[in-house]
């Protein structure tokens, strides 16, 4: 992957700036010693503290929302409002999702752990697994397509995929 390539290239790497999809990859770059501290008045002024590394190794330029997609034919507005509700037995056999090892789902699970603790997150994951309509497969677009095909009623995906699919 990218980290291995940058390590192999060393000082010969043509990369000056790395744009990547989530915080875990930024953290891996820092841990691998592939970043350097940046001091920028413009970035410091325009990027809030919560979206930048305290040591100045990275600045977040955008955020993405991971949302719950729902069939507008089979799920009433307001029936599900929070990720936590995905573990409710109400949704047994109704959820499609991509692999839990996907970076986006790992980030969501990390957020659940951060907000509720490891014990809660483990129970949430168990409940979510019990509610799957099928074995995790495909990408975010495949989950939305599965809702349209009637395979499931709910899925999780990044917001921008819907716009790309319209």
Regions found by a protein language model. Give the residues of each.
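A beta-strand-loop signature enriched in Asp, Gly, Thr, and Trp
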Residues: 158-166
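Charged, often glycine-rich, active-site loop that binds/positions anionic groups
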Residues: 7-11
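Extracytoplasmic ligand-binding site segments that recognize negatively charged/polar headgroups
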Residues: 1-4, 14-151, 162
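Short beta-strand scaffold positions
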Residues: 20, 156-157
């Amino acid at each position: 992957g990218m980290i291995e390539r940058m390590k192999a290239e060393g000082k010969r790497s043509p990369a000056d700036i790395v744009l990547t999809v989530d915080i875990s990859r930024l953290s891996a770059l820092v841990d691998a010693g592939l970043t350097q501290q940046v001091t920028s008045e413009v970035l410091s002024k325009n990027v809030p503290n919560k979206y930048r590394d305290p040591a100045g190794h990275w600045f977040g330029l955008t955020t993405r929302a991971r949302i719950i997609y729902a069939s507008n034919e089979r799920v009433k507005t307001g029936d599900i409002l929070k990720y936590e509700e995905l573990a409710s037995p109400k949704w047994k056999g109704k959820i499609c999702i991509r692999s839990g090892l996907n970076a986006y789902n790992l980030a969501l699970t990390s957020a659940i752990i951060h907000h509720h603790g490891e014990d809660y997150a483990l129970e949430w994951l168990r409940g979510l697994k019990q509610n799957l309509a099928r074995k995790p497969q495909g990408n975010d677009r495949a989950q939305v397509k599965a809702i349209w095909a009637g395979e499931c009623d709910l899925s999780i995906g990044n917001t921008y995929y819907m716009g790309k699919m319209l």
